[in-house]
């Protein structure tokens, strides 16, 4: 994809979120099912206690049904490890609210970044300290800046990005985001991302084909301006409410993992979310250097 097209798609998506922030946020109140396993996998890799409902890296409950023996001992001793989290494209900060129940025996501090202040303003009810920063991540990447130049968060224990990578146009930029998330964590720190596979759902796939054709014509974008897996999706039948989204094939997921394999090891990968439990592919990585 050429950078001119990428800029257009970036602007279309930014305009969508600013205009539809309230209605979009209203549909994003509950945690995604995949988050539970992501946090459990990262906590286990980091040796952090307090995984939600005692899940192990593979989502299996500990024998006591709680957070495991180490969590109980830590809680009894009054030990609360500090855990720092970087959330790229935080939206309405619902992941930060989820962390309170996911890591009940840890002192969590979050650094959150998004380009849509209207979404973040709808947060409220936060029980952990959160430093929020407004930044046009995709626009900065298109301009050539590395991710670490687009925010001011310190290196953290965990870096996550959920529901964002499918808005990043072009495989090269998506690799740069994943690289930047690895940069954001300390040595041994963990990264978790979700990769949307919406075209595996026949209903969503049919809608995507219709809205993509309509939006492409309205925006004057030829079919060959897009990469394979690229679509312009609608929103609640609102006229002109389009956002750029990329469907991740299994082959591209493998390429993403390979692209960062010298810097991070794959801790876990799985599918979750949606009615069939397979709307998102998740990757959990641990930084080795």
Question: Positions of the model-derived regions?
Answer:
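Structural motif
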Residues: 148-151, 183
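A conserved beta-strand element that flanks and buttresses the S-adenosyl-L-methionine
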Residues: 160
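Local beta-strand N-terminus motif with an aromatic residue
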Residues: 82, 155-156
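Conserved helix-to-beta-strand junction in the class I
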Residues: 180-187
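A short, conserved alpha-helix within the catalytic core of class I
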Residues: 168-180
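Short catalytic micro-motifs in class I SAM-dependent methyltransferases
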Residues: 163-167
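Class I (Rossmann-like) S-adenosyl-L-methionine-dependent methyltransferase catalytic domain
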Residues: 1-58, 64-149, 172, 190-289
